[in-house]
């Protein structure tokens, strides 16, 4: 997933870093 495409279960640093 990319920064603009964050799933509901992803949030915080992982979403910002794009490591979802």
Curated annotation (Swiss-Prot):
Domain remarks in the Swiss-Prot or TrEMBL record: The cysteine framework is XIV (C-C-C-C).
Region spans: Disordered: 1-20
Stated name of the protein: Conotoxin Cl14b
Broad class of where this protein is predominantly found: secreted
Keyword match Secreted: yes
Transmembrane residue ranges: none
Top-rank taxon, per record: Eukaryota
GO CC annotations on file: extracellular region
Annotated propeptide span(s): 1
Tissue: Expressed by the venom duct.
4Fe-4S keyword on record: no
GO function terms (MF aspect): toxin activity
UniProt keyword terms in alphabetical order: Cleavage on pair of basic residues, Disulfide bond, Neurotoxin, Secreted, Toxin
Posttranslational mods: Contains 2 disulfide bonds.
Compartment(s) where it occurs, according to its Swiss-Prot or TrEMBL record: Secreted
């Amino acid at each position: 997933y990319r920064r603009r495409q964050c799933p509901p279960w992803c949030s915080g640093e992982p979403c910002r870093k794009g490591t979802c």
